[in-house]
Amino acid sequence: MSRRRRASKRVISPDSKYNSVLLARFINVIMRSGERSIAEKIVYGALNKAEARLGEGAMSIFNAALNNVMPQMEVRSRRIGGVTYQVPVEVKEDRAVSLALRWIFKAAAAARKRSNKMYMDCLCNELLEAYNKRGGAYKMREEKYKMAEANKAFSHFRFN
């Protein structure tokens, strides 16, 4: 058991354009080497393109895409009697949001490597794919669900 105290959650200030904490967290995920202005340009540009394509509000598109990608279940390793089981557990809200943001970022980055498009376009495409329940990020969520479903027999080993 650790003797250190649990680290307190940092309060993230909302982004300047849409006044959203979730969008500020997404900008933080995309940001590299402290270049916040570049990350903001990429995210805002992708949201503007998505808004122009669908004709809906940028924040409603972002929130819907995020809700479609957020996982409800995942598997955690639990060692019992010398055997390690993959135990399905429910995902807490904060972790679900963090996973969804990371998955959207990773899927857009993978698409960027495959094509010659700008990252802004790849991020826009990935947000629209997640909005329509398709794409790389949604596939990652479905893989989590398949793992949880396959190991449903071990759900009685849940964590306390």
Swiss-Prot record:
Q: Which GO terms describe its biological process?
A: translation
Q: Does the keyword Transmembrane apply?
A: no
- A Pfam family found in this protein is Ribosomal_S7
The yes or no answer to whether the keyword Nucleus is present is no
* GO cellular component terms, A-Z: small ribosomal subunit
Q: Which InterPro entries match?
A: Ribosomal_uS7 (IPR000235), Ribosomal_uS7_bac/org-type (IPR005717), Ribosomal_uS7_dom (IPR023798), Ribosomal_uS7_dom_sf (IPR036823)
Report which superkingdom the organism of origin falls in. Bacteria
- GO molecular function annotations of the record: rRNA binding; structural constituent of ribosome; tRNA binding
Q: Which UniProt keywords apply?
A: Ribonucleoprotein, Ribosomal protein, RNA-binding, rRNA-binding, tRNA-binding
Q: Which HAMAP family match?
A: Ribosomal_uS7_B (MF_00480_B)
What assembly does the database describe for this protein?
A: Part of the 30S ribosomal subunit. Contacts proteins S9 and S11.
The record's function comment reads: One of the primary rRNA binding proteins, it binds directly to 16S rRNA where it nucleates assembly of the head domain of the 30S subunit. Is located at the subunit interface close to the decoding center, probably blocks exit of the E-site tRNA.
What family is it from?
Belongs to the universal ribosomal protein uS7 family.
Q: Identify this protein by name.
A: Small ribosomal subunit protein uS7
Per the UniProt record, the source organism is Ehrlichia canis (strain Jake)
